[in-house]
Amino acid sequence: MSSPTDAERVNMRREKHPQIEETFEEHVHNAMPKFKKHYALGITTHTNDEDDDPRDHRQRGIHNPNFIHSPNDPRPPLSQPIKPRFSVHGTASNASVFSHGDIAPVRKTSRAGSLFKRLAGKKSTTSLLGTEHQQRQQQQSSNSLVPAAGLRRKMSTFIHGGSGSQSNESRGTRSSIFFPSTSNSRRGSATSTMTSGSRSSHPPDTPPITSQQQEQQYDQQRQQRPETREQEQKPPTLSDMPIVSRSPSFFMLDTDLNNLSDITNIISATPKNTESDEVRSTGANKTLKYPKPPLSSHKSTSASDLSHHKAQWTAPESWDIEEDANKLLATKRKAKHHHHYHHPQHPRPPHRKHYSNFSKPIEDKAVVEKEQEPPEKCPQPISTDSNDAQGLEIAKPIDESSGIQHSASTQSVSSFSSGATGASGATGKQIGGDQETESTISTVGEDEEVTNLRSIDSEQTDDTSFSKFDEEYDKAEYQLEKYYNDFSDVDLNRRYAIRIFNIDDTFTTLSCTPNTTLQDMMPQLKRKFNVGQGSYQVSLKVGKLSKILRPTAKPILIQRRLLLLNGYLKSDPLHIMGIEDLSFIFSFVFHPVATSHLNYEQEQRLSRGDFVHVDLRNMDLTTPPIILYQHTSDIESLDVSNNANIFLPLDFIESAIKLSSLRMVNIRASKFPANVTDAYKLVSLDLERNFIKKVPDSIFKLNNLTIVNLQCNNLERLPPGFSKLKNLQLLDISSNKFVNYPEVINSCTNLLQIDLSYNKIHSLPVSINQLVKLAKMNLFNNRLTSVGDLSQMKNLRTLNLRCNRVTSIECHAPNLQNLFLTDNRISTFDDDLTRLRTLELQQNPITSMVCGGNYMANMTSLSLNKAKLSSFSAELLSKLPRLEKLELNENNLTQLPPEINKLTRLIYLSVARNKLESIPDEISDLRSLKSLDLHSNNLRMLMNNLEDLELTSLNVSSNLLTGFHGSPAKFFASPSPKLAKSLLFLSVADNNLTDSIWPLVNTFQNLKTLNLSYNNFVEISDLKLQNLTELYLSGNNFTSLPGEAVQHLRSLKVLMLNGNKLLSLPAELSQLSRLSVLDVGSNQLKYNISNYHYDWNWRNNKDLKYLNFSGNKRFEIKSALDPEGKNDLSDLGILKQLRVLGLMDVTLKTSKVPDESVSIRLRTTASMINGMRYGVADTLGQSDSVCSRDVTFERFRGREDECLICLYDGKNENASSGHKISKIIRDIYDKILIRLLEKYGEESDGIKRALRYSFLQLNKEINGMLVSVEDGNTDSGLTSADLLSGSSATVVYLKGKKIYTANIGDTMAVLSKNNGDFVTLTKLHVPAEREEYERIRTSGGYVNNQKLDGVSEVSRAVGFFDLLPHIHASPDISETVLSYSDEMLIIATHKLWEYLDYETVCDISRENKSQPMSAAEKMKDYAISYGCSDNITILCVSLDKSVNQQSQFTLNREDLISRKNTFEDTVLRRLQPEIAPPTGNVAIVFTDIKNSTFLWELFPDAMRAAIKTHNDIMRRQLRIYGGYEVKTEGDAFMVAFPTPTSALVWCLSVQLKLLEAEWPEEITSIQDGCLITDNSGTKVYLGLSVRMGVHWGCPVPEIDLVTQRMDYLGPVVNKAARVSGVADGGQITLSSDFCSEFKKIMKFHKRVVENQEPLKEVYGEDFIGEVLEREIHMLENVGWVFKDLGEQKLKGLETKEFITIAYPKTLASRHDLATKNQNSSVLNDDLLFQLRTISNKLENILSSINGGLIESETPGNSSIYMTFDKNTKDAVITKSTESDWISFLDHLVTRVESTVAILQLRQKLQGGLELYTSSDSTMHKSVFELLDEILKIQTDQKQ
């Protein structure tokens, strides 16, 4: 065996001369583990002799030491019941399964170890693979994962069944034995790469070959090497471009085989297609004949919904990355001579902001096919080798051309230039392969690629918005992967510092270049640590796990990559960071070579067991303990998970003759574990969370396998041998890299469940119908665009297609019961699924439901949330007789049909967040209904006969209710009001209820929760509900709380009375012994707490956890003793259970206030910070601890213009933990930031840099404390439970007029503006976000149930030590300059944003802009009324220091004062009331939708939804800017404004809002509503296009007697209407009068701004000046551009009008597009008149030939009818509509065609054209005579 130095020498030689083939000895050496020489056992070569004893072909001792995992992983199912300690800790996908099936007979010689080997074998039963071949397979497996830029190079040979690394090397002397390694002889060695499977070398330099040539070569090789069959199935190499997990997977594998009654009632059916089995069985010599082992698959390290507790770091493949580093660095040196080289500044991590305009991925199959191509296009061969003509659509890379910004960086990712990358791109050279591979950019399969793309494009609907977003989405994936996997910017000559620890915690620091190997460092380390000449090694420790590094590892590159994964940037000084202690992230440890052994505790625990179910997790083992060898024959289940270097020798496997369940979870394996295929009796095999790239074909030998779990690996295909696993019932291959459906599994006809989620599968083959027993299939989060026929899958019960790109589904599965289609692109659904019970169609652009099919007959649950429904079909309701659950939230419904009473079995009905104006009385017929949610609608009254329902829960919050139909007397008169007895939860918050409703409320005697917040109640004395436990009365007009009413509430636990006008609290509150939450904030409390006989004192309410007095500015807490003089009545410390105490603005004259601690949050500050008002509101929810911490620093650093506002939200999977971290952060963060601000300076870049480093430093200090906890130190107060605790953080630093915001996690900050807009200052960091998910998977993590590693709800946080480096603390940073329009800053924890959208939050803030405390409380109360029961913290800061001024003005004081108080809409009610109708000079605006008639005729349902969106935008902006809605006619609005500025800013803002709205898919799919961008990529048109016209004048006002609204009459109105008629869609036309008035105002404004003249002097009155100046500021924030259209003739008006067109500044390019379209229009006026002239001239010629009278006329006279004069043209143009022009064009074309036809007829029959005069008319033939001649000729020809 050669030394490592020799090996490197060989590799260097091979890199220069790739034709030199690797020798057998070299291959064996490089495949061996380099740190345990005694593992090098015997190696034998397999033959293809079927009769050979499998024992002769085992691989002894060859293993992969690259594995690590976490504790408490779920165990796989076993064949027999097991002990509880081998229990499940996770979701159903990993639940224990007890199978009592028969076990295959034991062989004569019980070599149980060979069972392991079967999993490492190949498919064919006629051959067994040799060890050398397995090594080659593993080498190629490591090669199979290449970056996007380089993937084309390997596709040429992989796609058509070649080895994938077929090259000149294969021509060597041993080519018949092995396929050559791609580049490096160590490629298949024990240690893999650290590149997340995305770096591997490229094929050596070979000329491109065609697929036919490949097949011929393949067949020749096949004949020479029958044992290398698995190699011939090598999949194509595609780059790793993970997708983001958008929702949790609720479809996990149900692994309980003892309880499969629901899915094992197999419906007998013969597979429709049995050809596949025959093909597979006859494919012994040509692997290409197998139907579809997925020969081409993109890498998909998508988040898997795994369910493991305390997951440890799962690094990419291995921590040892020297192999790829060697290639990358070598490639970099060579790449400098090519155009493909990227400048080091280019690779930057992407930033989500670039894509924030898109709410979800949108479909385009062309983009799907080009999914992973780097920025530069190049030919990508695709596989066409399939026996199934309707097979897989092999995906191809997408063109990626632009860079995006890294979330933690202020710099942008440079766009990739085509010249810099060429066909394969720099990434290919930087990340893998030798120099020689540069020329092997294959052109094989180009024709197939083009054909495939064309076929795909032909299927795809032309939706540019879908296409654009899909392209951006896929591009971002490539950029993210490239950032972490790119070594091109590494300076090979630069020296990097690295700290290496000794086992006694001493350390030394070395300075090395990046390519320094561990072997090179060893002499220095031995000298530094003064050790002898013994054997030493270095381990990398991350979290609790250690990985031994190979001698050829490059620690500098490992350190660099780990730093990047932990949030540091390439622009940071990474070369000197190794000087610092980085053990809070990772550490290198120098220690002697020693075999693993159990400590005493572990050995005792193991010896106490029965050795039947053996648990060896987390023991840092390299081999099984010696003690196990004495009991191997008893072992039935073995769990060796989370042992980074574990290897199971063959002798151990041989002796474990009963082994039926094997778990090797997270063992860091990049190759399939050796010897596993020798465990012949295995029933359950769990290899999840590794980096396995290839399953050996010999897995067919494990024919007893029932359960296989391979989720979260790097698989791109499955081997043909998989088809032999006939007993397989449960298969989980989620979170892998499949682009094509692995068709080989269709031969496993006993499969019951398959999980294929989190891959990138584009289509399902027809052969899937062979799985006739399959009951559950999970395809969550793939790239499917359609689902075809599944009619042969007779037993399919559940199909999960959430988060795909499905536009149509016609599966026809006869027994399908559960279909989940959330977040797709389905606009209509009409599949024939007669047994369907559950249908999820949430977040689909559905505008109507088709009622034609029978799929609803058995349906019990239907979800249509977040669709585009504007109506619900009555016919549809009649077809849902068994429906029990119906969800229609967040649509545009205005009413429910009366036929809803046909849903007689309905139990749950939710129609929240719609526009319902009434509820049909027929709903009272639903006697089974238990839960009714109607919150956030426009209901004024509830239905009749409400008392007949038996509801337990009713939520009608945020409506316009003033009462119920009928009277309470009618309700009482009911013989037995069922509702009074059944109702338990009632929420009627945010309505217009008054005290008259109390008698009705009191009838609900069993009520537990009552929410009457934000109504108009004044008295509460009539409330008598003894069973009430929660009472919410916030935001009413209570002035007192009667003690009599309180006495009846003995069971009360929660009482919310904030936002009232209470002066005192009754002493009877002390009798509520169970009271735990009391909120009386923002009242007018002023009473003596020592007068406890009459007023409330808290001393008897010992269970109080939440007590809030904040906002009571006149309330005093004074020290006073009780009559006995023993106790201080002001002592708040007696409340031992207290968690939150709010005393903001309260006067404290006592010292008996508890100190803030980990268990209590205390607020005692004033509600002012730097002159700005601020307020805080929070609730504990169900938590028993204070998880959230807010803190403000006024005059931060002692400076008047600075303040710091922070909000921290503790996180932990255990609700009782996580609060300690947030408290520690609160105490130390400000000091860290002060220190770094001093270091980096006061400039903008310095501040942002200080903020970023402050978070990283904070994480260092927190994790440093957690490290000490790991070592047994508890001085910090933290415990081991906090190792999985962390905290989100949002920090707002105000300096002067700038706001700097930094955040990690899900605590969001929003800036509300007075113009109705808002700015999101933070970024959401959750695992489901694409950028976050990509980084998680790159670092080796996974996502389960929307939690990172199944633990954290956020992907960035401080803490979570056990999750490093999957989680990090690098913040997103934003910088905002405050403007006049900014009103309020809102910071809140994540639960608020789940229940209230940004728009609602900002509406509330504008409504309460002068009272931020009330705004915060109202947001909290709204969330509670909508159903929130978790903890929330909200912090509001009012930025407007002139809070007492009115925000909206008119020129008339009476108009301002007399704002109306009528609320016709729940949302509008939160805005300013509508202004009174202006009089005098006003601005009249007319609006109209372009081509609305055409759209209504084409898409009536879609237009119904679109019009609602249009009207909402119009009316919302009217309230914000102060306009009066005069009337509407159809889709046209007439609006009046008191000032020109308010009219213009309204028009501009509406145009911008229309562009941002979500329109139905039908509207955006046609030309009139599709996405149009300008040359810079700015969105210019999308959705409905609205024309607007504005005129200024003095119309005649008149009240409409019918509507009682002001109308305007006269010529001013007429002119305004005509001005709007000139506009095109998206334009705002202005009359000359309006422009003149506007210019006058702007001149006044200029005097105020430039000359500083007083408002009264300029405008004549201060009030008017304030109004106009405020509106001008709003206008300047929006921005505007004027374009002169010139004089235009207005229809019906005598004189011309000079028209000006206005555009928002950001949409100025609309003018160029409109002008261009007009000039290039086919139907422009001049062209039509020219065509008429041509027609007339042709007719003149024809008349002359026919002998007409035209020739007698003079040319001058001819022009009279040839062309129109200008006046005639203008008259025609003015009176003609678009349809008139189309008819005119048709008329002219017909005339021209007829004339030309007659001329040609004469020319053909008469031999030419001859002019005749009128006197010669008898000499020429008429046209009818000519036709007679033609008929005669035809008759003669027939005869």
Swiss-Prot record:
Keyword presence, Lyase: yes
One Pfam family cited in the UniProt record for this chain: LRR_4
GO cellular component, one term: cytoplasm
Source taxon at top rank: Eukaryota
Cross-referenced PROSITE patterns: GUANYLATE_CYCLASE_2, LRR, PPM_2, RA
Keywords: ATP-binding, cAMP biosynthesis, Leucine-rich repeat, Lyase, Magnesium, Metal-binding, Nucleotide-binding, Repeat
Positions of Mg(2+) binding: D1488, D1531
Domain Ras-associating, residue spans: 494-574
Catalytic activity of the protein: ATP = 3',5'-cyclic AMP + diphosphate
Domain PPM-type phosphatase residue range list: 1173-1439
Main enzyme class: lyase
EC number: 4.6.1.1
Function: Plays essential roles in regulation of cellular metabolism by catalyzing the synthesis of a second messenger, cAMP.
Protein name: Adenylate cyclase
